[in-house]
Structures are given as C-alpha cells and as structure tokens.
C-alpha cells in the first residue's frame, strides 16, 4: 500500500486565504484604501516618520563636513523646534549608499549621519508608492488619472532636493537638512553657489506658487459668494446643500459675470472644466520647471542664469543688479562651511 498525502485541502486553504487577502487589499469599500502600492507605502512612511522623530529628538551630532567637527541637530542637544534638524550624511560618505551594516557600529553610523539617508530614502520611495496608490485607486473607481499626475509635482520637487542635487554635487551632505532653519540654510547656500533666483525655471516656480495661491483664493471666494440660496433668509446657506446632490450648488454664470466685469471679459472662465484644469495645471507645471532647474543646477549647468556682468565696448564694467546679487552670493558663500575652507572657490 502506497503512502499518499492529499494536498487538495492545503491548496484550497492557501488559495482561499490568498483570495481573501487580495479581496481585502483591493477593496474600494474599505474606509482606507490599501492597494498593491499601499503594501509598500505604509511600512515605508511609518519607518521614515518614526526614524525622523527619533533622530530629531535623540540623534547625536553628525560630522556633516567630514572634518571631525560634528554639528548637533537634535532637541536633546540644545536645539529647539526652529533650529533642530536631521543633519545630512557626512561629506566623508559622499554619495555612497550607507545602511547601518556598512558602518563598524551603530554609533559610527549615527556619527556619519546614516539616519538622514534612512529617512530620505524611505520617504521618497514611500511618497512614490503613495502616488502609485493614487493612480491605482482612481483606476479601481473608473476615474481619470490626473490626481496622481498633480501629486507628481511635490514628489519631483522633493526628489530634486533630497536625491538629485546631492548626487550631482557628489555628497549627501549637500542635501537639504530635515528641519526649519536647515531648509533656510539650504536655500541660502543654493543661492550662493548657483544664483537660482535669477534662473527662469525658478521664476516659473514662484509664479506657480504665488499664482496658484491667488487663483485658489479667487476661485474659493467667488464660489462662496455665488452659492444658490435654498433656505430661508434666517438659516445658513449650508443647510440647503445635500451631499451628492445632482443640482449645482453655485451659479458659475454669476461668478463669471462678476469677475468678467471686475477685470475684463476674457479673464474669467465660463466653463467649469476648463477652469478647474487651469487651477490644477498652473501650479503643477510651475513646480515641474523648478524641479528641473534644481536638477540641472545639481550638475552645475547654470547656462540659463541671467547673472552675467554687463561690459561696454571698452571692457569697462557697467554696474547692474547682477553685480549686486553676485556680491551678495559671495558673502553667503563665505559663511558656508566656514571651517572646511578658508575662502570660497570663487575667491580662492
């Protein structure tokens, strides 16, 4: 008699579990949609958040410049919410991938700023998974895919300052510190070394942010001011609105007529779809351009900068605003990495 083992029940159980798991992951009825990208997103963002909070509070000083002069960024080392930061990885590490097992010990890993790479890489991949999850959820619901396209703007902006710029400059120590004052320091140093304020791509980004804020405020105020009254005068207008109602809740023709007469006729949209596409496209495209500008400057490709001095036919300098900006940049460069070199490369 042969010894036999019936595997059908085992396979059926496995398939049943796997089917239930897939059904739960891909269900659009859950209070929080998970999706395939969510399996990657949730642990990555949790790890990045926990590591960031722990480093912001407890991390020891980091030898950011690679000259054995560590800089403290944690709250327990005397910083406050404004001055605290997760300090970028040491210049001695460069752009090498630096997980904890590459160091001789945990203390050395902390001293060389390994937490910065840990937080940044987990965050970028987690945010990328979030963008993929937006596409996946839209696909499941039969929606058009423009939500994840819009989110690509902040994602590429973060990738530019946290990944592309350090790679282009040859060291993660040139990445943006993860803190408030560290962000401002990064901006000043970036201006000193690249004069980004004079770059047209950065100007497009400024127009995107301030223009987007203006358009958002204009749109919100116009809609709120042209709500259709469905209630008596002594009741709130909000009571007359039912979630999911098919009838429009505000008069776009009234808003269009008001704004067209306030500015001029063609400054106002009479098509709701065109209006909302414009509100989405304006800031997204501008942030794309800014990210492209940062990414090109990462490799010192500054050819689009309008910072050249003006010289007359005799070779004499004609003082201009570009010279004032260049002089200010040199002043900021002198303050940067003050112990790593005596003079900035521009003056050496």
Curated annotation (Swiss-Prot):
Record has Hydrolase as a keyword: no
Record-annotated site: Tyrosine radical intermediate: 165
Transmembrane regions: 33-50, 122-137, 146-160, 201-222, 278-292
Main location: plastid
Record note on cofactor: The D1/D2 heterodimer binds P680, chlorophylls that are the primary electron donor of PSII, and subsequent electron acceptors. It shares a non-heme iron and each subunit binds pheophytin, quinone, additional chlorophylls, carotenoids and lipids. D1 provides most of the ligands for the Mn4-Ca-O5 cluster of the oxygen-evolving complex (OEC). There is also a Cl(-1) ion associated with D1 and D2, which is required for oxygen evolution. The PSII complex binds additional chlorophylls, carotenoids and specific lipids.
Subcellular location: Plastid, Chloroplast thylakoid membrane
PTM annotation, UniProt: Tyr-165 forms a radical intermediate that is referred to as redox-active TyrZ, YZ or Y-Z.
Binding-site list for a quinone: 219, 268-269
Protein residues bound to chlorophyll a ChlzD1: 122
Positions bound to [CaMn4O5] cluster: 174, 193, 336-337, 346, 348
Gene Ontology CC, one term: photosystem II
EC number per UniProt: 1.10.3.9
Classification via InterPro entries: D1/D2, Photo_II_D1/D2_sf, Photo_RC_L/M, Photo_RC_L/M_CS, PSII_D1
Molecular-function GO terms, alphabetical: chlorophyll binding; electron transporter, transferring electrons within the cyclic electron transport pathway of photosynthesis activity; iron ion binding; oxidoreductase activity, acting on diphenols and related substances as donors, oxygen as acceptor
Key word Cell membrane present: no
One GO biological process term: response to herbicide
Function comment: Photosystem II (PSII) is a light-driven water:plastoquinone oxidoreductase that uses light energy to abstract electrons from H(2)O, generating O(2) and a proton gradient subsequently used for ATP formation. It consists of a core antenna complex that captures photons, and an electron transfer chain that converts photonic excitation into a charge separation. The D1/D2 (PsbA/PsbD) reaction center heterodimer binds P680, the primary electron donor of PSII as well as several subsequent electron acceptors.
Protein name: Photosystem II protein D1
The organism's taxonomic lineage, starting at the top: Eukaryota, Sar, Alveolata, Dinophyceae, Peridiniales
């Amino acid at each position: 008699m042969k010894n036999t083992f019936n595997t059908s029940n085992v396979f059926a159980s496995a398939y049943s579990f796997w089917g239930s798991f897939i059904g739960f992951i891909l269900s659009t009825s859950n209070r929080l949609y998970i999706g395939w990208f969510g399996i990657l997103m949730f642990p990555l963002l949790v790890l990045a958040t926990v590591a960031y909070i722990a480093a912001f509070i407890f991390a020891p000083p980091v030898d950011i410049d690679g000259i054995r002069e560590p800089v403290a960024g944690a709250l327990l080392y005397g910083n406050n919410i404004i001055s605290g930061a997760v300090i970028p990885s040491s210049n001695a590490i460069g752009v090498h991938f630096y997980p904890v097992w590459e160091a001789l010990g945990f203390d050395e890993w902390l001293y060389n700023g390994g937490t910065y790479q840990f937080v940044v890489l987990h965050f970028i991949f987690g945010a990328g998974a979030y963008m993929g999850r937006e596409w996946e959820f839209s696909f499941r619901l039969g929606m058009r895919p423009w939500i994840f396209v819009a989110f690509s703007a902040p994602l590429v902006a973060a990738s530019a300052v946290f990944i592309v710029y350090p790679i282009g400059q040859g060291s993660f120590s040139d990445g943006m510190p993860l803190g408030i004052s560290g962000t401002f320091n990064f901006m000043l140093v970036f201006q000193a070394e690249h004069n980004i304020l004079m770059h047209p791509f950065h100007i497009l980004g400024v127009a995107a942010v301030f223009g987007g804020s203006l358009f958002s405020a204009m749109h919100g105020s116009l809609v709120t001011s042209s709500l259709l009254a469905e209630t008596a005068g002594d009741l709130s207008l909000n009571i007359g609105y039912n979630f999911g109602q098919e009838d429009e809740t505000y008069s776009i023709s009234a808003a269009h007529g008001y704004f067209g007469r306030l500015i001029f006729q063609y400054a106002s949209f009479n098509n709701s779809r065109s209006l909302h596409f414009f509100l989405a496209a304006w800031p997204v495209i501008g942030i794309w351009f800014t990210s492209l500008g940062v990414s090109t400057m990462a490799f010192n490709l500054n050819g689009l900068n309008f910072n050249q001095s003006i010289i007359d036919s005799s070779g004499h300098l004609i003082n201009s605003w570009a010279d004032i900006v260049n002089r200010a940049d040199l002043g900021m460069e002198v303050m940067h990495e003050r112990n790593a070199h005596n003079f900035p490369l521009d003056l050496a």
